[in-house]
Amino acid sequence: MLHHEDESSPESDSDFDASELTDKELQEAFSQGKLKPGLNVVLEGKKKPFNDASGLKQSLKDLKNELPWVERLDVTVDPVVDTTGQNGQTDPNTSDINAEDDFQREMCFYRQAQAAVLYSLPRLRKLKVATKRPDDYFAEMAKTDQHMQKIRHKLQLKQASMEKSEKAKQLRALRKYGKKVQVEVLQKRQKEKSAMVTQIKKYQKGLSDKLDFLEGDQTPKKTPNKTGGSAAAQKAKNTPSAKRRYKDQKFGFGGKKKGSKGNTKGSYNDVSGFRGSVAHGKGPHRPGKKGGKNANKRPGKNVRQKMKSKRR
């Protein structure tokens, strides 16, 4: 209980002080006649602003000190010209720099600081002011190298994310274009398929005597003039198509097929398979004839039975 009272006592004291301070303000307002029925404090109107130019100039004169440049070290310079052009800028005009681009903004600060150093160092040397630290001097930078490395890493990550987002936009555009091309290709294939089915139906019904898609030429052939035409064109016209030649090779030319390969003049005159040695019995073997060198030497039935009984 005591501990609880100790903890709550500062809060109660502060509340009491605030209320006491408020009461004092109310008493002062009442004594000044600012309190009226329905109001705690009379609201005063807005104060009219006024421009005291002479007073401001006098204050500036009191604050201003005509000190030498060594004591002030203030310079007003433009950024160094970016000769590399890596940031898309080759002149010192800073109006073209995009303030939202972190790299351009930081590079502008760097170039302006570089210009200030190039302007100030010769003047300091002329005034014989040391510009290099002694060997035993040690002072930490306002921002450590680790902090600057973190900033650099953060800027690089931001730049990489921007490039990644740009690539994603390009990929989305390419996908849209690819889908469009794919739809066009599918429509073209469907159109070709419909045309092929129509040609097949016409061919089955006898309305057409050729199928162009089998020949690989779906473009209509130009008919030569009746009055002229080259000899090669006439020969190509009289030559049967590849489909016709394949069917002729497979099924023949129509008509009777049975017995067409024997007892004809061509087969009678064909002596390519004739062998004289076999025809006149001079060959090594004449089937159907007993005796000779290759006669059947199989033992008789009785001999075979005796041989069989001996084996048992």
Swiss-Prot record:
Composition bias type Basic residues, residue spans? 282-312
Name the domain of life: Eukaryota
Identify the species of origin: Xenopus laevis
Described function: Required for the processing of the 27S pre-rRNA.
The UniProt entry's coiled-coil ranges are: 140-176
Q: Where is this region: Disordered?
A: 1-32, 211-312
Q: Which InterPro entries match?
A: Ebp2
Keywords, A to Z, come to:
Coiled coil, Nucleus, Ribosome biogenesis
Question: Which Pfam families would you find in this protein's record?
Answer: Ebp2
Name the chain's protein: Probable rRNA-processing protein EBP2
- Asked if Coiled coil is a keyword of the record, the answer is yes
Report biased composition (Acidic residues) as residue ranges.
Answer: 8-20
- Name the family: Belongs to the EBP2 family.
Cellular compartment(s): Nucleus, Nucleolus
Q: Which GO terms describe its cellular component?
A: nuclear periphery; nucleolus; preribosome, large subunit precursor
Major location (coarse): nucleus
GO annotation terms (biological process): ribosomal large subunit biogenesis; rRNA processing
